[in-house]
Amino acid sequence: MKKLTNVLLDGKPSTLLFEGDRIARIETGSAPLEPGDIDGRGLTAVPGLVDIHAHGCLGLDTMDADFAEMAVFRAKNGTTTWLPTSMTAFREDLERVCAAPRDVPGARLPGIHLEGPHIAMSKKGAQNPDCIRMPDIDELRSLRPAAIRVTIAPELPGALEYIRAAADMGVSVTLGHTDATYEQACAGFDAGASSLTHTFNAMPGIHHRKPGPIGAALEKGAFAELICDGFHVAPPIALMLYKAFGPDRVALISDNIRPAGAPEGEYDCGGMKVILKNGEARLPDGTIAGCTVTLWECVRRAVSFGVPFADAIRMATATPAAAAHLDAGVLAPGRPADVLLVDLSGPLPELRTVVLRGDVFA
């Protein structure tokens, strides 16, 4: 049985034993190395990251319906499970994405996150307005079982019925690209939604007389996706969200788009022109288009903002996995053998090794 030994797990010397691509058991203390074993070199072991909202990278995009190269990029950068996330697009394009092979080398792909197309025109952000349409549960059925998470604006006609039906199918429903009032968002959560999509972005903010979707999520115990790059949400506000919701309800996401990991220039993202300049991706009118740093870098930035490392890791592993109903993000017997080895000797954590499916990947 292969093992990963000489690691720190929750601060204690530990050994993880693998059977196939799963953890068989975890033992206290280090063990002698045998051929094929992995030497953790005294580094800290944490679960592989879980990104439940990521569109593209390297000039590629989920809408291309080819995930192989992107999955390798994710894994090399510490994300071992991810949900390729669609743009708001026409039904035939979404069907093509949901039919694309997901059994590829690299990060695990348990399903697709549909960001739209049932969103508010007033909060479309970088989504293509020509593809926005009213809720249609038959369309969602046509995209199952690949579609396992969906973003919707709860104030749209028919949205609550859609949310109930989606939740009954086991789909994780998240409210986003919405102009909903507090009351409308509460109704969405009561109908079965359980998250906010990229909290603060493409939705009303918190006002002392209009708490809006964020106030509703806080009241209803929902999860809150957060792009923690310091650009989409100011660091003090990101820290405020963490303190208000806690690490068990804030799910860090990359929201990576096509230009992530690619040179500066112009890109087509879901039919929208996006310009990457000085590390920021925007539409020609200045609208923020998406994030270009990895989820691991979001973890590092969360730590730099004042979030304890253990909480930052939880917000990028167990919490997003729970938000999207995924078997990932936890190191325990029977769970995926996806492990990051991290050096905590400096001011910020450094990723040293990625173990994916029980083998060293990067």
Question: Where do the PLM segments sit?
Answer:
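His/Asp/Glu-enriched, well-ordered alpha-helical/loop segment
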Residues: A216-E225, Y242-S254, P259-V342
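Conserved, mostly hydrophobic/aromatic
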Residues: L114, A166, L196, A302, ...
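Active-site gating loops and adjacent loop-to-helix segments of metal-dependent hydrolytic enzymes
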Residues: V72-L83, M121-A146, A187-T199, K210-F223, ...
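Residue-level marker for buried hydrophobic side chains located in beta-strands
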Residues: K3, T44, G48-V50, T174, ...
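Divalent metal-dependent hydrolysis catalytic cores, especially in the metallo-beta-lactamase
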Residues: H55-C57, A68-R96, R108-A120, P145-E155, ...
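Active-site core of metal-dependent hydrolases
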Residues: L143-A262
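N-terminal metal-binding scaffold of metallo-dependent hydrolase/deaminase domains
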Residues: M1-P32, V355, D359-V360
